[in-house]
From Swiss-Prot:
The keyword Acetylation applies. This is Rho crystallin. Monomer. The lineage of its organism: Eukaryota, Metazoa, Chordata, Craniata, Vertebrata. The modification N-acetylthreonine is found at residue 2. Coiled coil: none annotated. The keyword Hydrolase does not apply. Belongs to the aldo/keto reductase family. One of its GO terms (molecular function) is oxidoreductase activity. Transmembrane segments: none annotated.
């Protein structure tokens, strides 16, 4: 199938997700206004899939960017596929609605196209919220993931969410949701870190067998925010083999890294706040990697997580103790 910026995948609930989206995470020291301008640029050049999260603290700015492009007639609300995420401190069933409504309010929308459980680890709101919060520790909670899922299903029934999914779940955790008695809605996707150094082949195969779309963040090897990433890890885009293949196609290493994942049938979220790069990333639809180059890139897998969220490694639901 020829891939274009208009290509969408059909989710198991019948809704459609664009195969390329704009990731909007930014380190705390990055001005929030840049997110708003990035969204405007992305929509202007053809992106229709915008991914955000409560924990990034910029949903209000993302929403401003989207609404400005709706106001000027560039797009209609129904043209945009917007993803939000329920943070781990809102997993208690009685908190799910509050978490969703906060995101809806901040982004200025009546509904979200997709809402994800951000990580499978529940945290108490009295503790730290994310790794940048150095003043207090994380306090683990023991909320049943299935109970959170049931509360999310109720929000979908209420019309506040079009599709439901998960993020950073392993196979065992997905199976618990899928095997839940009385399940109303399957997760439509599992959003995970995935790139040349972490190809996620086993998890991808499992998700495909269950009609769950794999969506990838950190496709370029992650940002270099020391709150989340070990800065001693190798820089993916500097990989000599990746760069050799990029030169062969007269493309950037970033374009090849993204095209590799797209050709595997995985939805890509490309994070950039630089207008030129946002536009350049659409170049992934202008070429196709040959089978031998796909095979070479597959061989670079190191099972390397740039963002393993080690601060919650002792949580009983920490996902990366399992093989996949």
């Amino acid at each position: 199938m020829t891939l274009t910026k208009e290509t969408r995948v059909t989710l198991n609930d019948g809704n459609m997700m664009p195969i390329l989206g704009l990731g909007t995470y930014a380190a705390p020291d990055v001005p929030k206004s840049l997110a708003e301008e990035a969204v405007k640029t992305a929509i202007d050049v053809g992106y229709r899939h915008i991914d955000c999260a409560f924990i990034t603290g910029n949903e209000m700015h993302i929403g401003n960017g989207i609404r400005s492009k709706i106001s000027d007639g560039t797009v209609k609300r129904e043209d945009i596929f917007y993803t939000g995420k329920l943070w781990c401190t809102y997993f208690s069933p009685d908190m799910v609605r509050k978490g969703l409504e906060r995101s809806l309010r901040d982004v200025g929308m009546d509904y979200l196209d997709l809402f994800l459980m951000h990580w499978p680890v529940s945290l108490k709101p009295s503790g730290a919220s994310d790794p940048s919060d150095k003043d207090k520790p994380f306090i683990y909670d023991n909320v049943d993931l299935c109970a959170t899922w049931e509360a999310l299903e109720a929000r979908k029934d209420a019309g506040l969410v079009r599709s439901l999914g998960v993020s950073n779940f392993n196979r065992r955790q997905l199976e618990r949701i899928l095997n839940k008695p009385g399940l109303k809605y399957k997760p439509v996707c599992n959003q995970v870190e995935c790139h040349v150094y972490l190809n996620q082949n086993k998890l991808h195969s499992y998700c495909k067998s269950k009609d769950i779309v794999l969506v990838t963040y950190s496709v370029l090897g992650s940002h270099r925010d020391r709150n989340w990433v070990d800065l001693s890890l190798p820089v993916l885009l500097d990989d000599p083999i990746l760069n050799k293949i990029a030169a062969k196609y007269n493309r950037t290493s970033a374009e090849v890294a993204m095209r590799f994942i797209l050709q595997k049938g995985i939805v890509v979220l490309a994070k950039s706040f630089t207008p030129a790069r946002i536009k350049q990333n659409l170049g992934v639809f202008e070429f196709e990697l040959k089978p031998e180059d796909m095979k070479t890139l597959e061989s670079l897998d190191r099972n390397l997580h740039y963002g393993p969220f080690r601060e919650v490694k002792q949580h009983p639901e920490y996902p990366f103790h399992d093989e996949y």
